[in-house]
């Protein structure tokens, strides 16, 4: 499965590995703002996504539908991806928000130090008739282990969809994206293997310069 992303996200515990902490912290803040539904952040992400998809698929983009991976609740899903879907639709890119249904709330429970989703209070369903035969491009905000997107992809494929690609706003890494400092430790700790094949959408990367609380100056 092809996986692509726009930004690197470095957890706070590893931020001191970064030679350009200010830049990485700005990238992290952008991810937080997007997840919170900040319209400026969503607008920028939409512009990146439209540009990337148009470049990759050109005239056949109309044959695909962009599907957003489920959040912890339906209202968060609507807030996070509703505006993004509207922008993509204006650009002529189909989305499927109304065909993904989230029931309950995803709450992590501890199991031997790991986090497991309690299926008794959370369930995701998709409209099988709609997705049967559809060519799908999946989008999610953050790629860490890949487990969440893998589970959702399996659900769509079971409904008869063909998932062509997965795209993420950011990929979680536990090393410095500039110097690669810490990458050997990341590999040793098992963080790296599951998503090592993922690639940047734009090889040169993207830079986020935040000018004020709700105003971004974007460079791609």
Residue spans for each PLM region:
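PRPP/pyrophosphate-binding module of the type I phosphoribosyltransferase fold
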Residues: 99, 107-208
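Glycine-rich phosphate-binding loops at beta-strand->alpha-helix junctions
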Residues: 70-79
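Short, well-ordered alpha-helices that flank and scaffold nucleotide-derived cofactor binding pockets
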Residues: 51, 86, 90, 154, ...
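Long, low-complexity, intrinsically disordered segments
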Residues: 202-220
